[in-house]
């Protein structure tokens, strides 16, 4: 399933917004630095994963067809277009409703 650019932007903005929220109680000193570092690592990991996933889905959707799918596409491209029925040629006019409407093609 390809990830649309709009959805990717929404996910990234959500990750940025939650990483920027202050914590309740406000830890101070070394704990605060550690929490900020952990949040930065999580944010970086999430962004790396989303970039990898977007690249992977883009390659998967543009990848070549293999096996049965390739044969089916080749058969459809090489084959003659489907023939229209000869019944239309024999019966060009048809009454749809009694005494009201007829269609001639």
From Swiss-Prot:
Chief localisation class: secreted
Keywords: Cleavage on pair of basic residues, Disulfide bond, Hormone, Secreted, Signal
Compartments in which it is found: Secreted
Classification via InterPro entries: Somatostatin, Somatostatin/Cortistatin_C
Signal peptide: 1-18
GO cellular component, one term: extracellular region
UniProt-recorded Gene Ontology molecular function terms: G protein-coupled receptor binding; neuropeptide hormone activity
Signal found in the keyword field: yes
Propeptide: 19-74
Pfam family, one: Somatostatin
Disulphide bonds in the chain: 93-104
Biological processes annotated in GO: adenylate cyclase-inhibiting G protein-coupled receptor signaling pathway; chemical synaptic transmission; regulation of cell migration
Organs and tissues of expression: Expressed in a subset of GABAergic cells in the cortex and hippocampus.
Protein function: Binds to all human somatostatin receptor (SSTR) subtypes. It also inhibits cAMP production induced by forskolin through SSTRs.
Family of the protein in this entry: Belongs to the somatostatin family.
Protein's UniProt name: Cortistatin
Organism: Homo sapiens (Human)
Underlying gene: CORT
């Amino acid at each position: 399933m390809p990830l649309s650019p709009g959805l990717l932007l929404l996910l990234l903005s959500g990750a940025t917004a939650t990483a920027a929220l202050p914590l309740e109680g406000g830890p101070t000193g070394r704990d605060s630095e550690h929490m900020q570092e952990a949040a930065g690592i999580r944010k970086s990991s999430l962004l790396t994963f989303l970039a990898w996933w977007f690249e992977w889905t883009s390659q998967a959707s543009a990848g070549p067809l293999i096996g049965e799918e390739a044969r089916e596409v080749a058969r459809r491209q090489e084959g003659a277009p489907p023939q229209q029925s000869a019944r239309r040629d024999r019966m060009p006019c048809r009454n749809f409703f009694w005494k009201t409407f007829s269609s001639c093609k």
